């Protein structure tokens, strides 16, 4: 699904979180929203998801105005930073949660859950509970649950922030391979420039609610637009 963000602004009290943001995201791309704390990256992701309403501007999904559309109508999967798994449900039950709500046929539901557990390399953990899993495994369960409803867009809010450096690096490689397999338009938030540069096909760098530069890791490294980009990416 293609995404067009058109002149989006969002204020929280006196704080300008987003200031006339314009961005086009191509169908099937893997995009990283990068920036320091308070830059607006997570707010932009939440506006995309329908979890926050913009003060002005429009969100277009595949050419359709989705600005006022509810999250459940946007065909979007959202993965929260803290995973938001249900501790009293098994891995399989967590993955199947959205399918249960939609009253999907039990055989189709089981088939879909098994496919996702295999895709996430979690086949052996279907009957386990979240507290029996590592952080990396819990993150993969959260991704499987987000993908269960076959969304056209996958949004991830700092998906690896709570993990140690070794696991983060492993999951970055795994997520890149997963995106190559499923080709779902994917947007993730990070404050870690090395993570964005390793994972994203296109990086959107924000500061103070504005987009400062858009480009590949190579383009940002070779042609930084100003001293903020140079300093933030450690190019000095």
UniProtKB/Swiss-Prot annotation:
GO cellular component: ATP-binding cassette (ABC) transporter complex; chloroplast
Pfam families: ABC_tran
TM region positions: none
One Gene Ontology molecular-function label: ABC-type sulfate transporter activity
Superkingdom per UniProt: Eukaryota
SUPFAM superfamilies: P-loop containing nucleoside triphosphate hydrolases
Family the UniProt entry places it in: Belongs to the ABC transporter superfamily. Sulfate/tungstate importer (TC 3.A.1.6) family.
Protein name (record): Probable sulfate/thiosulfate import ATP-binding protein CysA
Gene name as annotated: cysA
